[in-house]
Amino acid sequence: MRSAARVSRSNSHPRTRHPTRENEGTTWGSQPSRTERDGDRKCPPSILRPRRQECGCHGGEPQKTSRHVRFREPLEVAVHYIARKDTTAAIKVPSRPASHGGSPLQPASCSGSLFLWLTLCALLGVVLVLYCGQAKRVTAALEDLLAQLLALILRLWRVVLACWH
């Protein structure tokens, strides 16, 4: 009766462990060593952790670990970058479609960006002239330009209508 009561009490309170033959090596506060937990592994599971001395991979000397990762661009990206920097190079890049504008040997946005820069410079010049106080001359010139553009648009419209009929 007492032995049955002791068994039921020991199962109901797992905190009060008494050393037995199966767990003589482990006491309540200690944990099993790393080799017991990992089994019979020769090397640690992580490649980022340094290797242990008992793995036997490189003898008795400690191994120097390098954690630097070097990323390299794919070859066609590097060639494309070099071709964009060197304007005399004629390298055909197969990843860019020819329908994107121009030939595959030329950058597609060269003419567009040049026009954009020239337009921007002209607008900045006009703003600078207006800011400096010569607004009367610039305003008269801009009004004349607007009148000429309207006349040109009307002439083009008449030509289109004449060709249509």
UniProtKB/Swiss-Prot annotation:
Superkingdom per UniProt: Eukaryota
Ranges of biased composition (kind: Basic and acidic residues): 34-43
Identification of the protein by name: Nutritionally-regulated adipose and cardiac-enriched protein
Membrane-related topology note: Single-pass membrane protein
Region (Disordered): 1-47
Keyword Transmembrane helix on entry: yes
Induction section of the entry: Highly up-regulated during 3T3-L1 cell differentiation into adipocytes. In vivo, down-regulated by fasting in both white and brown adipose tissues. Reduced in white adipose tissue in obese animals.
Signal peptide, first to last residue: none
Cited InterPro entries: DUF4658 (IPR028114)
Record keywords: Cell membrane, Membrane, Transmembrane, Transmembrane helix
Annotated GO CC locations: plasma membrane
Subcellular location: Cell membrane
Spans through the membrane: 112-132
Tissues with expression: Predominantly expressed in white adipose tissue (at protein level) and brown adipose tissue. Also detected in heart.
Primary location recorded for the protein, binned into one broad class: membrane
